[in-house]
Amino acid sequence: MAKATWSALSAESANLATPLNGVATGTTVFIGDIENTTNKDFYLGLWFQSGSMSPTSTGSISVILRRKRGSVYAENNSEIQVLGLTGTGSRQVNLAASIRIPYAATWGLFIQNNLGATIPASGNTLVSFTWNEEVN
């Protein structure tokens, strides 16, 4: 397991959905900082399930990593992973993806709602886990 710290997590797997509750379509929200102090890249897996959405949604969720220097997040130094597309007319979004966390750097994790609908104010789940590249 990669030795990494994430200030938003007290355990490897946690429900991180609170910042996403009620987020409007097209909006990007900050989830937390990820600091990779190892000399290897590691991977962050994310699984997101929304509460029941109204109206029904079709679209995607984007995971954005922005390199942090001091207290500034560099938008031009980003890695983006899209958590799949929902089916047309989905009332509940269930998406998963993994993203590489480059080593020896601190990254801000942001998630963008591209679902075409507001994420419900409750009933959402966002779970994360990490693994290093030697394992996979």
For each predicted feature, which ranges?
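Noncatalytic modules at the cell exterior or secretory-pathway interfaces
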Residues: 41-46, 100-121
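C-terminal interaction-tip segments
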Residues: 1-15, 113-136
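Solvent-exposed serine/threonine-rich low-complexity stretches and specific carbohydrate-binding patches
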Residues: 76-88
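Short amphipathic, basic-aromatic surface patches that mediate peripheral association
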Residues: 46-55
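Solvent-exposed, flexible loop/coil segments flanking beta-strands in beta-rich domains
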Residues: 1-40
